[in-house]
Amino acid sequence: MARTTPIARYRNIGISAHIDAGKTTTTERILFYTGVNHKIGEVHDGAATMDWMEQEQERGITITSAATTAFWSGMAKQFDAHRINIIDTPGHVDFTIEVERSMRVLDGAVMVYCAVGGVQPQSETVWRQANKYRVPRIAFVNKMDRMGANFLRVVEQLKTRLAANPVPLQLAIGAEDAFTGVVDLVKMKAINWNDEDQGTTFTYEDIPADMQDLAEEWRSNLIEAAAEASEELMEKYLGGEELTEEEIKAGLRHRVLTNEIILVTCGSAFKNKGVQAMLDAVIEYLPAPTDVESIKGILPDGKDTSAERHSDDNEPFSALAFKIATDPFVGNLTFFRVYSGVVNSGDTVLNPVKDRKERFGRIVQMHANKREEIKEVRAGDIAAAIGLKDVTTGDTLCDINAPIILERMEFPEPVISVAIEPKTKADQEKMGIALGRLAQEDPSFRVSTDEESGQTIIAGMGELHLDVLVDRMRREFKVEANVGKPQVAYRETIRSTVEQEGKFVRQSGGRGQFGHVWLRIEPMEPGGVGYEFANEIVGGVVPKEYIPAVDKGIQEQMKNGVLAGYPIVDVKVALFDGSYHEVDSSEMAFKIAGSMGFKEGFMKAKPALLEPIMKVEVETPEDYMGDVIGDLNRRRGMIDGMEDMTTGKIVRAQVPLSEMFGYATDLRSQTQGRASYSMEFLKYNEAPSNVAQAIIEARKAK
């Protein structure tokens, strides 16, 4: 089967935004104008096509990034058909992992901002992730029809809050109820969309007389931005010559692709204005798979030799699985992005991360939650496979004869855990299956068993994250469960260096046990590898076959903690001396000696308890400012700063996670429901001694 759309006409884009910027409505309109959806789905009624989990429709927030394919030939049918693959990304901070993994497989992004609320705290998190993966992006300022909408104020905030270099491509004509259309600064024409056919058709008109000067001013800003793309354009511009429309667009495209500028468009998705022109901007300014760098990876040859793949059908097949979803009808759906080559349904490929072969049973292309079966996928495509057995998010799938491991995604460690048990014995097994499925879908969600109590523990990125998962278990797997009180993931560490002997001797008749080691235990830089073992034995005083056993004994003790039973981090241990017995020494004896030595040494090396600190941002009306700050101080918060917003203030603080439980309810009652907050993990800090003491005693009492 030949390629139907040339790869240069592909656009793999994400639509990313703060919770209420109107992202889902914007995506809905895209699907409507590209002719996929004939009835526009409204989030207000909980019927949007992209939000396909029941919960998302109920809560009105987008949780999973659904992938959808659409075609667009331009507002005036001025292009050949372009294939746009859209990954919808969530805007809630507990789901940052979803944003991170979608950024990884995108070539470009559309950032949606609310014309009233502007750049909100959550937008910064998404922005940082887009920077991390160097994703070229354009902005769409939505909700121009709302009270208090102000396009140029949002442009200014992109500069001040995100340190971006925004260049408006359009200006809004009017605002609030008087918002009628946009000025296209490249063509210097006003665009008016037809209300009768929901904005499918439009007319170019003259720019309103009262906007002519403003339009001239912003057009010269746009042309200057385009001219900076190359020396030739700059010379022409400085020489006073007019740049042609083609030259302006080529210059702007070059600067968007190199991440030098962010083009800003505007409109009101709800009122069917502006999304159409934003789609044209996606085609004209965002990259095709061939415009971005080739994908880097390593060969699974044990030497980590670096390798790369280009967006080309003739290169060996390589793809990245970026999301696993459980589907009610077919089981696991593995969403993947093809970076190179071609794969057909029925082909067998390699998962080099797990060194397993996988067969592509059926390949489907998703349109929100409707699916269409296809026979093959090619470089640049995004699709889902049914029936892959052992693939986790971030795994590579590739040609068996040309193995490569593509750059993996890094997932944060969970910071909050709760005990969970099924309401009835009959649900025990069902709960196990459900949790297993959910953990496979979401790498930032972990399931484990507490060895002492036998309870099942689930851990994740925040209270909302775990709520949503427990809720999904109830709906999708019909498992009712009781959830315990949230527990914080504390860690233990040391602050000074000690040398400690560890000796395990049992010699009373029969085969004895003898293990003897000397360890040097020292603190390491926080946030690094977490643990390092150094073998400094000289002259075989401890035979080399016993050395891994010492390391293993130390690691087991680290997992179980010493102070209060929490995992130990940021410690380097060197084995520098010891002795052995010809007959009685064994791996077991050295493992116990290592563990004993480490445990004793740890308690002498100024042990400390670490607690997770969260970055908290609260948006509040000014009247409640004092209460909010007072409350954060009571929660041992450290205020980082404040910022003015149109609707009040943003307070930024660092607060220990243990103090943040139930914060949503408290904040609601303090501010009569008018404030909102977001919170994400920042770092581990040493807990104050009174707090640490209370935690240690509570653990011992158990």
Swiss-Prot record:
Residues 8-290 form the tr-type G domain. Keywords: Cytoplasm, Elongation factor, GTP-binding, Nucleotide-binding, Protein biosynthesis. Pfam families: EFG_C (PF00679), EFG_III (PF14492), EFG_IV (PF03764), GTP_EFTU (PF00009), GTP_EFTU_D2 (PF03144). This is Elongation factor G. GO terms for biological process: ribosome disassembly. The gene is fusA. One of its GO terms (molecular function) is translation elongation factor activity. GO terms for cellular component: cytoplasm. Its main location: cytoplasm. InterPro entries: EFG_II, EFG_III, EFG_III/V, EFG_IV, EFG_V, EFG_V-like, EFTu-like_2, G_TR_CS. CDD domains: EF-G, EFG_III, EFG_mtEFG1_IV, EFG_mtEFG_C, EFG_mtEFG_II. The keyword Ubl conjugation does not apply. Catalyzes the GTP-dependent ribosomal translocation step during translation elongation. During this step, the ribosome changes from the pre-translocational (PRE) to the post-translocational (POST) state as the newly formed A-site-bound peptidyl-tRNA and P-site-bound deacylated tRNA move to the P and E sites, respectively. Catalyzes the coordinated movement of the two tRNA molecules, the mRNA and conformational changes in the ribosome. GTP binds at residues 17-24, 88-92, 142-145. Belongs to the TRAFAC class translation factor GTPase superfamily. Classic translation factor GTPase family. EF-G/EF-2 subfamily. The keyword Repeat does not apply. It comes from Photorhabdus laumondii subsp. laumondii (strain DSM 15139 / CIP 105565 / TT01) (Photorhabdus luminescens subsp. laumondii). It is found in: Cytoplasm.
